From Swiss-Prot:
ATP binds at R123, S170. The keyword Magnesium applies. Its cofactor is Mg(2+). Disulfide bonds: none annotated. It comes from Syntrophus aciditrophicus (strain SB). Substrate binds at M47, G197. The gene is thiM. One of its GO terms (molecular function) is magnesium ion binding. It is an enzyme of class 2 (transferase). This is Hydroxyethylthiazole kinase. The keyword Metal-binding applies.
């Protein structure tokens, strides 16, 4: 199994033609930007977090994205209910453990969601992935990663072995672990780190690609590749982070097969 420009473009076309409904229980900071990115890609976003309706909403969605960026007890209950319903329906579940390791509550919540239902894809930075291994000691790592992505590969392997989840570790090189393979993608630009919420956007795009793909490892790799390609193209014409946000959406909307073929950078695979 390998990511190629051809299968990545085929997935983009599938998203654009099918417009899969992606149910996001995400944080206040990124709701708008995440929804706009999904729309630009061609998917259909919905942001619903009330426990009274999440199961019903999952019932019509093609993927569920759970993001713990802004937590409250009612949201945690809604996340668990939605995840159980998604598992019952057999649709992809993407978990973004934002800031896991920063506080005990955040780390426990991420671990409880992992235990409640094994997510299809877990996407986080290296510190967040490593936090799953320190859940007993509650080592504080912070919201932004203090680790290189390659430092979490072994932890990602263990998560994959234990829960069957594809693990996507974002960083300068994105590592995707699953299907008895490790894929490495090296697209993107340093300016992307100056825009809040692009990691959360990547998780949402994982949901869109998982909705049209039978291989969730490939779906995560394709999502990270498209995210990185659009980001680096946007950075090339942006003097700062404000304009990058605007150009990112436009380029995601206009992305072509030629863009992917010219820019996709695969640096590891086995």
């Amino acid at each position: 199994m390998q990511i190629t420009p051809e299968n990545t473009w085929a997935a983009v076309k599938a998203i654009r033609s099918r417009a899969p409904l992606i149910h996001n229980i995400t944080n206040y900071v990124v709701m708008n930007s995440t929804a706009n990115a999904l729309l630009a890609l061609g998917a259909s976003p919905v942001m619903a977090h009330a426990q009274e309706e999440v199961e019903e909403m999952v019932g019509i969605a093609q993927a569920l994205v759970v993001n713990i960026g802004t937590l409250s007890p009612s949201w945690v209950r809604a996340m668990a209910s939605a995840a159980l319903k998604a598992a019952d329906r057999g649709i992809p579940i993407i978990l973004d453990p934002v800031g896991a390791g920063a506080t005990a509550y955040r780390t426990r919540t991420a671990f409880q969601l992992l235990e409640t239902v094994s997510p299809t894809i877990i996407r986080g930075n290296a510190s967040e992935i490593l936090a799953f291994e320190s859940v007993e000691t509650m080592e504080t790592r912070g919201v932004d990663s203090t680790e290189l992505s390659q430092n979490a590969v072994d932890a990602g392997r263990r998560l994959n072995d234990s829960y069957g989840s594809t693990v996507c570790i974002s960083g300068e090189t994105d590592f995707i672990i699953g299907d008895r393979a490790i894929l490495g993608i090296r697209n993107g630009h340093p300016l992307m780190t100056r825009v809040t919420g692009l990691g959360c956007t990547a998780s949402a795009l994982c949901g869109a690609f998982a909705a049209v793909n039978s291989s969730f490892t490939l779906a995560a790799a394709q999502a990270m590749a498209v995210m990185g390609i659009a980001g680096e193209m946007a950075a090339e014409i942006s003097p700062g982070p404000g304009s990058l946000q605007l150009h990112f959406l436009d380029i995601l909307y206009r992305l072509t097969e030629e863009d992917i073929a010219r820019r996709l950078r695969i640096v590891a695979g086995e």
